[in-house]
Design a protein with these regions (language model features):
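Structured alpha/beta or helical-core interaction and ligand-binding surfaces enriched in interleaved
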Residues: 1-142, 148-173
Length: 173
């Protein structure tokens, strides 16, 4: 069993770099400043959707999700969130083998890829039973990914395709 940090950044940021990268709340940013964050969300979304396509036999756990979570989003973010969910559902409905439970799973996958407005540390967990991996939320754009089996190359290649990075050891040192 190996646990890695799944991240959009290749290296850990020091305090000064982190302050430059996360210098404003998302709600205070203009459209141009939001672009890198939206790109990050799309990377995670593509990665999680690819995993789901590979292994539809998954178990997920959300600590909670309430309507008040939307209070932290600006109006444009709420619109972006709702439109993205609709787009995912339309895309899934176009597939021949679409189950009703897929709709909820797609929404949950999108929530997990979205900034950590909806969750808290270890608030989300997804277990893909055929691939034998567990993904646990850590912070914004950063997750633990635990390989419970020795066959992890397929997922590591998927991480690279999604332009994400796996780091090992830095969280324990």
């Amino acid at each position: 069993m190996k646990t890695y940090v799944l991240d959009v950044l290749e290296n850990v940021l020091n305090e000064e770099e982190a302050n430059q990268y996360y210098y404003k709340a998302f709600i205070e940013m203009n459209k141009k400043e939001k672009i890198p964050y939206i790109v990050n969300e799309n990377r995670y979304l593509k990665f999680l959707l690819r995993l789901y396509k590979m292994d539809k036999n998954m178990v997920y756990k959300f600590r909670f999700f309430e309507k008040w979570c939307f209070d932290f989003l600006s109006n444009s973010e709420k619109l972006h969130y709702k439109n993205s969910i609709r787009k995912l559902r339309r895309k899934a409905l176009g597939k021949k083998k679409f189950l009703n439970k897929d709709k909820d799973i797609l929404e949950m996958i999108f929530k997990m890829s979205f900034r950590d407005v909806f969750g808290f540390q270890k608030g989300y967990k997804i277990y893909f039973s055929n691939l034998k991996i567990l993904i646990t939320s850590l912070t914004d754009y950063c997750y633990f990914i635990t390989f419970l089996d020795k066959d992890e190359e397929k997922v590591k290649n998927l991480v690279k395709k999604s332009k994400l990075f796996l780091r090992w050891g830095e969280i324990w040192s």
